[in-house]
């Protein structure tokens, strides 16, 4: 299935709004300080959403880091050659002393970043540490976490 960048961005934007507007204290896998420290959990929920819409997709989760001892981490999704990041704006909120100069100089970061990976700033800031492959049913993920994703997803969509 070949999705357009516009279709992906529209869904990512809608999903980000659902997270922003939800009851963060009572929604599974969404934390109070969203978007700060929320990149992996939010990306997992977004991958669940994408796979509910488009079950034939293969999504890549990208774990990356920068800074001294790779202490600043980030996580985003890729669909084919398209980067999808719905928590990059956390780096606008984190104190300068906790970040690298490269991150500080890149501000302000958008809340939703969807672009072709060869045009994405993420690869200039972060080093990829590992990637994960997500397909419908999440065969590589523990059942209890899949259940939590389903619960959080339903809370977001049907609140």
Question: Which residue stretches match the model-derived regions?
Answer:
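A structural boundary/capping signal
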Residues: 1-159
């Amino acid at each position: 299935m070949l999705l357009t960048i516009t279709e992906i961005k529209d869904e990512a934007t809608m999903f980000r709004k659902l997270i922003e507007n939800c009851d963060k204290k009572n929604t599974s896998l969404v934390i109070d300080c969203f978007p700060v420290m929320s990149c992996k959990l939010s990306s997992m929920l977004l991958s669940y959403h994408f796979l509910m819409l488009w079950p034939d997709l293969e999504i890549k989760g990208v774990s990356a880091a920068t800074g001294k001892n790779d202490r600043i981490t980030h996580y985003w999704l890729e669909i084919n050659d398209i980067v999808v990041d719905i928590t990059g704006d956390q780096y606008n909120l984190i104190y300068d002393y906790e970040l690298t100069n490269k991150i500080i100089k890149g501000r302000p970061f958008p809340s939703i970043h969807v672009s072709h990976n060869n045009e994405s700033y993420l690869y200039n800031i972060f080093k990829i540490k590992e990637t994960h492959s997500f397909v419908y049913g999440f065969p590589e993920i523990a059942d209890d976490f899949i259940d939590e994703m389903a619960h959080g997803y339903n809370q977001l969509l049907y609140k």
